[in-house]
Amino acid sequence: MRAGKHVVLYVEDDADYQDMVREILEAADFEMVAASSAEEGIRAWDTEKPDLVIVDLMMEEVDAGTSLITDLRARGCDVPIYMLSSVGDDLAMSMDYGALGLAGVFQKPIDGRSLITILKARLD
């Protein structure tokens, strides 16, 4: 938390989607730190220490999101991590949340109200 706002690290390679999620989060009084790749996400985690992380499943590689989550957990990241995916419900059904340490999966296109409701419930 910084200046009374929860800090969310959002790792997403689509700039338009980053902008959209930033608008949703900032309207709900969150602060968003954006990273455009898994590598940037690691650096942002190391410097920002956010309260929560949202990771896009498919970035520069098909499973870059799952690799990033594994790397973050190995670095001691103990905050809730959510995955964002456009793959569909098959992913949600096949994903081993326990193995990845995920708090959940959001589907694209994301519903802003649901996102905020879930994040606030998790952080407050």
Residue ranges of predicted features:
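Non-catalytic signal-transmission and effector/linker regions of two-component phosphorelay proteins
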Residues: 1-9, 74, 107, 111-124
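Conserved sequence signature across two-component system core domains
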Residues: 11-12, 35, 53
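Two-component/phosphorelay signaling modules centered on CheY-like receiver
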Residues: 14-33, 100
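Helix N-cap/capping motif at the beta->alpha junctions
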Residues: 34-43, 64-65
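Conserved phosphotransfer cores of two-component systems
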Residues: 46-48, 71-78, 100
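Active-site residues of response regulator receiver
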Residues: 56-57
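Alpha4 helix (beta4-alpha4-beta5 surface) of REC/receiver domains from two-component response regulators
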Residues: 63-67, 74, 88-106, 113, ...
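Hydrophobic/aromatic residues positioned on beta-strands within the core alpha/beta folds
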Residues: 84-85
